[in-house]
Amino acid sequence: MTILGSISSIGNVKSITKSNNLSSLSNSSSSTQSMNSIQCGGGCGNGGLLGGVGGLVGGVLVGTGVIIGSVLHGVGSILTGGSNNCGCN
């Protein structure tokens, strides 16, 4: 019985570890999304190019493909600073 008890407790530790990994992944993706909204809103009252530079630096620090894709998609809004370029499309 002690062998079975120790095996089941090992299984519990593995499941706890997996759930912790999943929660950290979901936290990571939500912070990526918030960085994305900052990135895409570079032309929304932030001073155009100068406002977008801060978003670009933040995107480089995060270093994800999603951020890079949003930078490439939103370069026009960052450069022009148009008032109707708020958020990601």
Swiss-Prot record:
InterPro entries: HssA/B-related. Pfam families: Coiled (PF05710). Belongs to the hssA/B family. This is HssA/B-like protein 22. It comes from Dictyostelium discoideum. The gene is hssl22.
